[in-house]
Amino acid sequence: LKIAIIKSIINNTAIINSNFEKCMFIDIQFNNCNFSNTIFENCSFIRCEFNNCKLTGCDFNENTLLDTNFINVNMNYTNITISDLKNVYFKETRLKNANLQNNKVKNIKFQEADLTQIQIFQTSLNGIDLSKCKIDGIAISIDDIKGATINQVQALDLIYLLGVKII
């Protein structure tokens, strides 16, 4: 049994340390909301937008994120695992110390996102432009970063993947 919330605007709401299971969020705009440390288990976010929200420490497990935007969102320490992400946009969003693991991704975009110390495993970034993001201390495998677009400075953050040392 799924709970569905459809075509709504949710403003200035705080729902922290909570659990959402098998929920569908369709055509929802979240503005200035705080969902810190909330678990979203087997949920779907379809055509949703998060604006100036706080999702610190959230767990997105076995979720579907389709046509969803995160604009100026604090997602530090967030876990996104075993999820499908299609047409997802992260703009000016902080994902410091976040974890992306075992995800299927298609057409995701990062614009000026802070990916400092993010851990990405079994989530391919092939074809994704990271050149305008901060990736200091990123933990990622060579297979997952292969095919991503990075700038010259970022290349130094990823040189360890080649097993070489710069002196």
Functional labels for PLM-detected ranges:
Residues 1-167:
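Tandem repeat scaffolds
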